[in-house]
């Protein structure tokens, strides 16, 4: 009798485990179509920034000029979800971008505010003489622990700098509520959320994987000359130096990972901070800094889980970076930020009246 009970218990356990196992290898959960010219392998770690799309333009062609659109970095909560903040402030077209933070659950959120570049004594601000390789400044996305990704809820005058996305510990991704390039953070669950303002706030990451963006974002460091003029370096990787006469100059050297090349689709950079949502793309598979799989789950939300990805996931592969520098799944580079309280969750489809189309701009992450 005891032996029979043991067999029954074992059978039930096996059935339970089978219920959580993917019906097929998760790496095959990919769209049938691919993005023309998309890059499925990217050599360096990168983040994402939320860039609103004009509703009057077509979804596939809307996008791009950094100077004409506001960008907000997505944040990620620990559960892997990705969220954008609810507000967006105007951002500038400078070469540095606020980094995205990640919360423990994997969610991604963007910060709520972004700081402007420092001004010199006489108040003048000047850019360096090199502009060909400079990348646009984008706010980094933070990740919360759950892996979710969310975008912020409000948008101000758009500019080329994007708010960073944060990630929570669960993998969710969230963006901030303002478009002034608020950084995205990630919470521990992998969710990605953006802060309430997109003013390029830096993104942090909570233990659950969610990504959240900090409430403020710093702009590229500016150098100052003795006469009070302030000059911005062409890249944010190098610290500004000071000459004996009091002038402050930025070094000409830049890190190899941040330097733009003719074949590099990513033209924006952001400062990386603790908790910043960091992603890697290899063979069409997107992973966050904790090795969780970027996927479109059953409710069409973009978040990080596993591996393996969440049961019922629709797509877990087929990611790429488009020639315009946007993240794409299959042949689609248009995502939707849908209002959820003070944050936007990110989806690959329009799921309700509170949703607006966005691009998820890839941004190189640098140490500042």
Curated annotation (Swiss-Prot):
Residues annotated as site: Cleavage: 72-73
Site (Covalent attachment to cell wall glycan): 81, 107, 124, 148, 172, 191, 210, 229, 247
PROSITE patterns recorded: PIR_REPEAT_1 (PS00929), PIR_REPEAT_2 (PS50256)
Keyword line: Cell wall, Cell wall biogenesis/degradation, Cleavage on pair of basic residues, Glycoprotein, Repeat, Secreted, Signal, Stress response
One of the GO biological process terms: fungal-type cell wall organization
GO molecular function, one term: structural constituent of cell wall
Propiece span(s): 19-72
Domain of life: Eukaryota
Record PTM text: Covalently linked to beta-1,3-glucan of the inner cell wall layer via an alkali-sensitive ester linkage between the gamma-carboxyl group of glutamic acids, arising from specific glutamines within the PIR1/2/3 repeats, and hydroxyl groups of glucoses of beta-1,3-glucan chains. The propeptide is cleaved off in the late Golgi. While both peptides are secreted, only a fraction of the mature glycoprotein is incorporated into the cell wall.
N-terminal signal peptide: 1-18
Domain notes: The PIR1/2/3 repeats are required for the covalent linkage to the cell wall. Their number varies among different strains of S.cerevisiae.
Function summary: Component of the outer cell wall layer. Required for stability of the cell wall and for optimal growth. Required for resistance against several antifungal and cell wall-perturbing agents and for tolerance to heat shock.
Family under the similarity heading: Belongs to the PIR protein family.
The protein's name in its UniProt record: Cell wall mannoprotein HSP150
Taxonomic classification: Eukaryota, Fungi, Dikarya, Ascomycota, Saccharomycotina
Underlying gene: HSP150
